[in-house]
Amino acid sequence: MSCQQNQQQCQPLPKCPSPKCPPKSSAQCLPPASSCCAPRPGCCGGPSSEGGCCLSHHRCCRSHRCRRQSSNSCDRGSGQQDGASDCGYGSGGCC
């Protein structure tokens, strides 16, 4: 075995690259379902979010009262789903 081949075998192994930090998850807008706030990225998007609510289920409505198909009343705490498609579900029948 030649001298040059021995030198190649004795070279140190390349170091492993340092692990990259995982990307930070963007903060989500998750206030209580009964509170309204200004639309933020990752929460309420689209034209229906203008002046709407940021809800935990990421659905929007224009006012704090649900626009139900049958009536414009808000059944607080009833747990019934809304009739309006642009009003969030799972908020006790209210946005």
Swiss-Prot record:
Residues 1-13 have a biased composition (Low complexity). Pfam families: LCE. Skin-specific. Expression was readily detected in adult trunk skin, adult arm skin, fetal skin, penal skin, vulva, esophagus and tongue. Not expressed in the cervix, rectum, lung, colon, or placenta. Residues 1-29, 68-95 are annotated as: Disordered. InterPro entries: LCE. GO terms for biological process: defense response to Gram-negative bacterium; defense response to Gram-positive bacterium; keratinization; killing of cells of another organism. Signal peptide: none annotated. Keywords: Antimicrobial, Keratinization. Belongs to the LCE family. A structural component of the cornified envelope of the stratum corneum involved in innate cutaneous host defense. Possesses defensin-like antimicrobial activity against a broad spectrum of Gram-positive and Gram-negative bacteria, both aerobic and anaerobic species. Upon inflammation, may regulate skin barrier repair by shaping cutaneous microbiota composition and immune response to bacterial antigens. This is Late cornified envelope protein 3B. It comes from Homo sapiens. The gene is LCE3B.
